[in-house]
């Protein structure tokens, strides 16, 4: 069954799970953007019924688009929602077959992950139903390889069309009105949330997180504009453009992933944001809390944006200029777009098409950077990609974003730690561009695994959702290894759901009594060495080491009992 969104006054009774009559095409776009405040995957196809000819009397430029243009717009901006777009003359039998096949594939969370990655066929009517780009079902449930190919091979003309559509959307859709709670009090509270190292990501809705991103990127752009007002080739996004950009980035993440979702992206961005403030690359702001161990408590002061402070933090010499700082923050925001909720090891072991394409090297990170650059930024902010990172260099923001995202591959972790040690002791002499790339890479790496450096309650929340995602991967492995007997592993007719992450440490420990095992392993193997070395190079980040040590001692003590 499917959700039906009809703009032609017609429903499809034999397919209808939920029916919404939509008054106009702009209203349809608003509805689809708002859907991603829900923190689940789309587990049913959405059938959109559009009139083949646009209404002659409408004043909306979006409404006046042709059927083919509307189809292109919808499939570009909302393909994560599993859309089947039809006009009045749809073929009943073909539509019913497509919806039935899509419904079967989408029903279960583990099945969805297998289908996205291209590692399973056990629930598919034909082996190539998802992986053949000419297949109708491939467009309804876009796999990773489908998304990669469509966006990497898109023509210049199509890109220009999509930029035009984006401009129309920004002109006609007020993204601030799409936020679930845009009251001044709530927006002010979010300013203070951004200012805390104990960033309460799991107590914030997806819409709250969108506004948090808006706050941080706006602050960085304002600083860039102040430092470099003469760059006329760089397009400064309006407030509505920037918020729309964040909505679009959010829609590129898989909301149902327990860990690698939009919330994680915002958390990594917020960690990078704190790093660059403490390192002097951005000035501190009024809502910034210098004590990293203070627990967040909701408060507001009426300010709905971050207010720059006149006071600078002590002994700060900027390590990145304003353009490089913005590049790092944007890379953090997009560093996991399209993440399927698996690991590189999984993708390689089970011959995922993307692993074959990227020769088993940084598979997911290569995918994230390609999709973020070619699908999102090339349409939403092309002038940012072309911007030089410095007046004396050929290194562009695009180059920095790619190198930063690739650095988040944990398979390359030891190599970066060794480079850090060499750089720290002056054994490795780098030119200016490579120094900027290394500093950016190290900061995003630290931010990516900063969960263990957050105060214990927040850190344990992240540990809990990560354990959920690892458990899903193990279930998927079992399904692949026993495809002939999938029903004995999991009921594919039922979806997998989770309770909301508790905000109380003791409740988390009750639900996950062995949480300390993974935390001790990760801190010992990866985090402690990286953060101790980065703090020697950048002593302003010493606080991360102090919190890691406190958390580690807690987990070690718990492991004794």
Protein language model regions, located:
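All-alpha helical catalytic cores of prenyl diphosphate-utilizing isoprenoid enzymes
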Residues: 235-238, 258-267, 297-301, 337, ...
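Structural signal for hydrophobic/aromatic residues that build the beta-strand cores
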Residues: 6, 19, 28, 32, ...
């Amino acid at each position: 069954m499917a959700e039906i969104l009809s703009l032609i006054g017609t429903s499809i009774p034999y397919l209808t799970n939920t029916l919404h009559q939509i008054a106009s095409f702009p209203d349809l776009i608003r509805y689809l953007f708002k859907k991603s405040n829900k923190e689940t995957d789309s587990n049913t196809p959405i059938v959109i019924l559009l009139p083949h000819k646009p209404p002659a009397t409408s004043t909306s430029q979006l409404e006046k688009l042709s059927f083919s243009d509307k189809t292109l717009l919808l499939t570009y901006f909302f393909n994560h929602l599993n859309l089947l777009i039809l006009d009045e003359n749809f073929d009943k039998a073909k539509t019913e077959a497509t919806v039935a096949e899509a419904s079967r594939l989408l029903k279960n969370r583990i099945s969805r992950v297998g289908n996205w990655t291209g590692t399973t066929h056990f629930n598919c009517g034909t082996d190539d139903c998802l992986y053949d780009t000419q297949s109708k079902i491939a467009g309804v449930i876009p796999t990773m390889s489908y998304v990669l190919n469509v966006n990497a091979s898109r023509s210049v003309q199509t890109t220009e069309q999509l930029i035009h559509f984006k401009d129309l959307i920004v002109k006609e859709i007020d993204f601030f009105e799409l936020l679930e709670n845009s009251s001044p009090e709530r927006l002010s509270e979010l300013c203070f949330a951004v200012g805390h190292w104990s960033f309460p990501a799991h107590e914030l809705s997806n819409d709250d997180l969108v506004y948090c991103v808006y706050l941080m990127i706006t602050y960085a752009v304002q600083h860039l504009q102040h430092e470099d007002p003469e760059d006329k080739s760089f397009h400064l996004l309006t407030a509505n453009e920037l918020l729309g950009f964040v909505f679009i980035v959010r829609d590129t993440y898989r909301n149902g992933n327990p860990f690698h979702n939009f919330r994680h992206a915002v958390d990594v961005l917020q960690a990078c944001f704190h790093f660059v403030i403490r390192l002097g690359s951005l000035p501190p702001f009024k809502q910034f809390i210098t004590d990293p161990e203070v627990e967040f408590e909701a408060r507001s002061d009426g300010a709905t944006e971050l207010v720059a402070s006149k006071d600078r933090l002590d002994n700060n010499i900027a390590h990145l200029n304003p353009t490089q700082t913005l590049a790092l923050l944007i890379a953090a925001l997009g560093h996991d777009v399209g993440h399927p909720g698996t690991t590189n090891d999984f993708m390689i072991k089970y011959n995922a098409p993307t692993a074959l394409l990227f020769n088993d090297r940084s598979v997911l990170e290569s995918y994230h950077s390609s999709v973020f650059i070619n699908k999102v930024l090339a349409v939403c902010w092309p002038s940012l990609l072309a911007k030089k990172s410095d007046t004396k260099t050929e290194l562009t923001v695009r180059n920095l974003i790619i190198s930063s995202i690739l650095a988040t591959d944990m398979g390359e972790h030891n190599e970066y730690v060794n480079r850090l040690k060499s750089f720290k002791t002056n054994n490795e002499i780098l030119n200016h561009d490579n120094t900027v790339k290394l500093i950016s890479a190290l900061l995003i790496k630290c931010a990516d695994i900063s969960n263990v450096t957050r105060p214990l309650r927040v850190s344990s929340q992240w540990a809990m959702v990560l354990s959920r995602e690892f458990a899903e991967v193990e279930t998927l492995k079992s399904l692949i290894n026993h495809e002939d007997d999938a029903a004995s592993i999991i009921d594919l007719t039922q979806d997998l759901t989770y309770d909301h992450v508790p905000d109380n440490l003791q409740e988390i420990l009750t639900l996950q009594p062995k949480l300390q095992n993974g935390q001790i392993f990760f801190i010992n193997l990866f985090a402690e060495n990286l953060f101790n070395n980065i703090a020697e190079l950048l002593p302003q980040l010493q606080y991360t080491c102090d919190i890691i040590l406190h958390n580690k001692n807690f987990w070690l003590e718990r492991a004794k009992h």
